[in-house]
Amino acid sequence: SANNLASKIPSSKVYVMLAPTRLEFYGPEEYRTGSHSQQMGISTAYLALNPEVTGVDAYSEIARHTDEYEYFRTDHHWTARGAYYAYKAFCESAGLTCTPLDSFQSGKLDDFVGSMYRYTQSENLKKNPDYVEYFLPRYDVSAESFSTADMTDGKPLRVISTNITDESSKYLTFIQGDKPLIKMVSSCGSGKKVLLIKESYGNALAPFLLDTFSEVYVLDPRQESIQGMNIPSFVENNGIDTVLFCNYTMVPSNSKYMNALNTMIGA
């Protein structure tokens, strides 16, 4: 998909970031029998990329910080801290300046019990909740969500929501969860524009892009309700200079996601 898209938008740079999951770094040995190294899988996927597509080595940056709170225990996502290290790896790949994490104003929401509890109903998980750490954009930002590619039906959106009380919904802190299409505008002044193509791992990553890009577009191909989306045309019409695919390692085997994405890219 990335190779196909890159061939259609030669004036834009295309990057692919595959995010490892918690299991790669913290999974008990007895549960890893028969599972393949995600690092090896990521490397194999990147070898299939054409020269005009850059694979982002988020894995190594995340691996350097495994003593930090990079993944939730009760949920299948990475934390904002884990997403930051992936963002740092992207900046290095793209030749962009990455702001140190301690330069962002931060906060947290306590008592988050996520998807792993929902699947298992484990009392042990319930008794040991996570917290959701967030990092606020350093610049003035605004955001809207849309259901059409021409972006005529905008609804206001919060980039970071700091007041979510439902214990199972606190990952919605980041861009209010999964929307078909989002446009975010930052006063960072770079003049750069990026399209982030993602599933839910990208939600925690998206706010950091506002530190580097004046406009950040976020597309979730799983939300097939979006009308009229042709990604090459969208990139051209909006003057987007950078496209970043951010997905966790299992997404390439998700046929629904890949079919929707390929339809939006076109043959």
Where are these regions (language model features)?
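Extracellular glycan-modifying ectodomains
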Residues: 1-267
